[in-house]
Amino acid sequence: IVDFAHAMGVPASSHEIYPAAFDGMDSVEHVEGTSRRGYSPKMTLGRSYQDVSTIIGAAHMTMTPTLGPRLYDFLTKHPQMRNDPRLALDPPWLKQQILSAPAHADYSGTAKLVMDVYRAGGRIVAGTDQPGPIYLHSELQSYVDFGMSPYEALRAATAVPAGFLQLDAGVIAPGKLADIDLVEGNPLEDIASTANVRQVIANGRRFTVEDLVSGKAKDTPR
């Protein structure tokens, strides 16, 4: 599979660690979880072995942590977001699950694994594995909480994944493809500002958050 993907010029990703690195896989998904074949967990009881971060880093693989459960921490730090209309896009069961998460869950092991991979040479890219739009902002906040600078966290959601996926995007420059979020605040000083979206420019069209949440955006003529 890896050889075929690479022959097509496509990066390959999976849930694996050791077999993936050995076979030349480009990326690994999720900071927790297994290969789904009952072995090769990245973390056990909130901790990971050093060889996990060493192998991923030495192979210069990309890792997408998908820290969706930490949305509770994000909402605790920024309580005004609990009434954000974008949360209404979540299915009720998922919203209830997130809002009833443990108030003081210990993510120190998760933080150590993410930063160990990053410092060992791995590339961290922001992804959520969750449908709602708030999760990405929570993901970026987690990276800063773990030790990244806001600039590094922003790159994890823009230039780094664009480079990994070989997309002509991820930066604002002549000739590049770019959807642009207009936010209130300076994310380079406070990463939570990324959640203060006021307008979005996508495919040359400008939308408000209300347009996107209500579904009006899909009816807007090109």
Model-found features: residue ranges?
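Divalent metal-binding pocket/active-site signature
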Residues: 1-26, 69-72, 108
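Generic hydrophobic/aromatic pocket-lining and core-packing "Φ" positions
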Residues: 2, 17-18, 53, 114, ...
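Loop/turn elements at helix/coil->beta-strand transitions in domains of secreted/extracellular proteins
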Residues: 6-9, 24, 57-62, 119-123, ...
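Acidic, glycine-enriched loop/beta-strand segments at the rims
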Residues: 134, 145, 149-154, 162-197
